[in-house]
């Protein structure tokens, strides 16, 4: 633990000061003698990477040693909470380790055989098995459950939904009855109506959103993690399929080309959006500043920061810079809102995770 005293601008408010002692934030002097490490500048509640896989790697096999190293790469840019939407590696032994972020896990993805990345997640033989798979996740105690909502169907040569609407509705109800929330990977348009009607709590990616589905998202308060820097990878994802599945290729390219317009429309309509990098596959760890910068192309800079900070923390049940709250902080020498408006976030001058300087 570190004894810290901060003075400066405290986002999302204004000028202020606080102390960190025994791992917690104190808005008045806690009465301890110190010595105090002085911090000045701009304080932001610790960042959340709302779509980050430390248990998935693009090469070799994941393990806890590597997972820990990857999490530290995220901490270095200010990430103090990782929402991990699917992992075959149980990363729970990393919980509570000094210097590491807090985790919100979902267990393994739920998909269908030949309808997701080979070897990743639980891949069912038949859609009718979804309800039982969701029940297993709920019994495991995960606060969220991740479904693969669409993927290429090679029999039609394009993105297509994995699950019948009635099965989805029953599966989501089972999760909710157990106190779990449900999110779904969706690239295209066709899977969205069934997922939204079933009452999922969030959509990952969401590049196929349009006026009707955006309206439903707003009405139902369904969150969106657009993973904008992952959508930037669509050309390289689709290229290997260009000749064999030309319809899929053109579809993915169209989703890519209109991505900013799609997410700007979602933001302007009032969809709650959160920052996530999809690190662990195509994207490297420590990329959250890039995702925040991408979000700032479709919403105001302060809202892009909020999507990775205080709004994301509230969404997942974590406190901000509040009296008595666990101290997770990012400190900047310059105003991150101004820097973001001029092209990108600066490097933090300090990161505090679990009450200690990282």
Model-assigned labels for residue ranges:
Residues 46-52, 82-84, 103-107, 145-147, ...:
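Hydrophobic faces of well-ordered beta-strands that scaffold small-molecule active sites
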Residues 155-261, 269, 274, 279-282, ...:
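Active-site core of metal-dependent hydrolases
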Residues 177, 256-335:
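His/Asp/Glu-enriched, well-ordered alpha-helical/loop segment
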Residues 64-178, 222-231:
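Divalent-metal coordination cores built from histidine and acidic residues
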Residues 1-35, 42-44, 335-339, 356-357:
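N-terminal metal-binding scaffold of metallo-dependent hydrolase/deaminase domains
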Residues 93-97, 192-199, 293:
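Distinct, well-ordered alpha-helical segments
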